[in-house]
Amino acid sequence: MAFPAPAFSLANLLNGSYGVDTPEDVERLRSEQREEAAAACRNYRPLPAVDVSESVTEDAHSLRTPDGAPAEAVSDEFVTYGAEDYLEKSDDELLVAFETMVKPMRIGQLWCPAFNKCSFISSIAMARALLLAPRTSHRTMKCFEDLVAAIYTKSDFYYSEECEADDAQIDISSRDVPGYSFEPWSRTSGFEPPPICEACDMIMYQCPCFDFNALKKSCAERTFADDYVIEGLDGVVDNATLLSNLGPFLVPVKCQYEKCPTPTIAIPPDLNRATDRVDINLVQSICDSTLPTHSNYDDSFHQVFVESADYSIDLDHVRLRQSDLIAKIPDSGHMIPVLNTGSGHKRVGTTKEVLTAIKKRNADVPELGDSVNLSRLSKAVAERFFISYINGNSLASSNFVNVVSNFHDYMEKWKSSGLSYDDLPDLHAENLQFYDHMIKSDVKPVVSDTLNIDRPVPATITYHKKSITSQFSPLFTALFERFQRCLRERIILPVGKISSLEMAGFDVKNKHCLEIDLSKFDKSQGEFHLLIQEHILNGLGCPAPITKWWCDFHRFSYIRDRRAGVGMPISFQRRTGDALTYFGNTIVTMAEFAWCYDTDQFEKLLFSGDDSLGFSLLPPVGDPSKFTTLFNMEAKVMEPAVPYICSKFLLSDEFGNTFSVPDPLREVQRLGTKKIPYSDNDEFLFAHFMSFVDRLKFLDRMSQSCIDQLSIFFELKYKKSGEEAALMLGAFKKYTANFQSYKELYYSDRRQCELINSFCSTEFRVERVNSNKQRKNYGIERRCNDKRRTPTGSYGGGEEAETKVSQTESTGTRSQKSQRESAFKSQTIPLPTVLSSGWFGTDRVMPPCERGGVTRV
């Protein structure tokens, strides 16, 4: 029996009857709740559940009644009441609903959280029940999809207080918020007065006591150019431009590249930052500390030692032909570097040098792989290649383009070398098994500290003639462009017009790197790699007859070096200079990588020739031993791995974009190269300067965080101080500023000789009275006329030959003239002649010009 609540009145309020529950009322309410709960338990009948786990057989639909109700209870491990519509859905539809509601994180082929059909359907049923249940909390419950995800992941069912505060649109005035005051905003002019130095009462930008570049904490992000003083602005900009760019409070000043004077006031230690001038001595000290064995390296006579010393080598099937060697072509000399960075001289392709290079690059092929079924396994590797890298729809819809235009571009490129359409041979009449061979005159810079014990061996090039390459190169170029268009998004080949190492929206930080170093890559390739390449080329759409023809004359070939007179047969190994060298090496590396590692675990994969680099969130899992046991490669997993490929480091800026930076250690070595030809107008030196500037165009993007990344990667890779890398960047910034700064790194001995001999601007001429031919005729007449054949000379009344020296006196003093004439006359020597009786005597004093026609001055 329910008692009416007491009415509100002053009497009930005073005696405590209104608004207060008496013990009798409390007991009455509890008894009513117990009766209602007992009635609900008596009337409740649970519905049978259906097991929709993986163990359901294919004929599970036959067990259902026509009305769709389950026939029997299979399992009661999960709740299905209210989710019958999801029980009838297929697995694919459930997966789509799972991705929509729960929004799992995909890591390779794994989902986090993992998909469980039973738990997902139970979460849907519980979410529907919770939304229909009466509200017992003042907090806002999540919407249906978010509630399903919260139940599945066992998280909070309600929105956080921050979200509730954002959803509740309440008008709150500034007076209602404690601790805050809101004032009307007014636009300012933006002018900030410059800081004034307390010591000299000058603007701190011009004050010698204040180093503005020493401020580490500034409003904007520091760039690399902030740490170095401008070398000079004379003739670059006028005063008006300088004044408008630097602000109204700065007067036009003449910028000099010099160190500021020592400050007269104390600077706090946290503001101290070195801004010393970069000079040639600093760069040399960096080389000495980073490359200790390179500073005293001089190979000026190393090749002379090799040619003149005893030589012993072990090669099979080598043919030497020393009868028609090509003599060395003399050049005009090379520029001499000021820096000593361990760079070597140009190598000359002599017989011994070529044999040494062939021994290292072409002969002694390693045999590390096991015996396998080549045809079956090569097809499996090629199939894995297409599954891992190629988008099948793009490959089916694409076609060859620009084959003919590539051919015309190739002919125009080499037109200056004498290649014309009339010189193209019939390929069926040519023996394509013969390759020309040569060594690279430029030796790759050595970054290891082994120059004191090891002499670098030059690389070799095996190539066809341009007339043959011009007919294969356009086809393979078009095929490579089609291959790039069909690659998946995470695969990058940094070659061509549509790809590069610049990756927008990808950050290399907080990633695991995988770098595989493949040694002896070219000569380690055998028949297995050739079959893999053939299957991949056919799959990409290359005409099968051309692929078969190309692979046939790569099974057995003969290389010959005409300059050195050396020839030898080779088989299967990669030709380092034909039309498919880069493309073939790239697809072979990609195929080997896909067979040893699951490519789905990587976010980005970069391939270029024999170089490979992968980025993943988790440590990469794979079997690198297959590179050796199956593919006959000497592979080494680089530890610790850093983002390094193609001799470049990959760095990320503050916006999450990745760009490439050349290896500073190799760039410093290139500053001391000895291969720049000499020219009077410095055209070759300027070409090297422009190449240097193009490689270092990244300097404008180097912020302080990028410099810190480079220092860490440099230290991890080379086990050398990372601070040296930052100092190298300072040198690069100076020598890329202008050509005059770059010219400080090189000089020529010819110019020194010209400067030494420049004191004499007069014409120096030697006139001969009696030539050698006249003297011989004179001797023959004397022997014929003189029967006694008496010796003739200064004692016998012979005539002396005189040397006349004519010299204009436009410049120079008379004393210099007399000194030069006396020095010239002092070098005359007696000329020996043959006596009639077999005795030797002295004919007369002759100048050296009559002995051999050469006068030393």
Curated annotation (Swiss-Prot):
Compositionally biased intervals (Polar residues): 804-816
One example of a Gene Ontology biological process annotation: positive stranded viral RNA replication
Subunit text: Interacts with replication protein 1a.
Protein name: RNA-directed RNA polymerase 2a
Catalytic activities: RNA(n) + a ribonucleoside 5'-triphosphate = RNA(n+1) + diphosphate
InterPro entries tied to this protein: Bromoviridae_RdRp (IPR047309), DNA/RNA_pol_sf (IPR043502), RNA-dep_RNA_pol_alsuvir (IPR001788), RNA-dir_pol_PSvirus (IPR007094)
Keywords annotated in UniProt: Nucleotide-binding, Nucleotidyltransferase, RNA-directed RNA polymerase, Transferase, Viral RNA replication
Compositional bias segments (type: Basic and acidic residues): 780-789
Stated role: RNA-dependent RNA polymerase which replicates the viral genome composed of 3 RNA segments, RNA1, RNA2 and RNA3.
Pfam families from the UniProt entry: RdRP_2
Source domain of life: Viruses
Region (Disordered): 780-827
GO molecular function: nucleotide binding; RNA binding; RNA-directed RNA polymerase activity
Family, similarity comment: Belongs to the ssRNA positive-strand viruses RNA-directed RNA polymerase family.
Native organism: Cucumber mosaic virus (strain FNY)
Domain RdRp catalytic: 511-624
EC class (word): transferase
UniProt keyword annotation of Ribosomal protein present: no
EC number, as in UniProt: 2.7.7.48
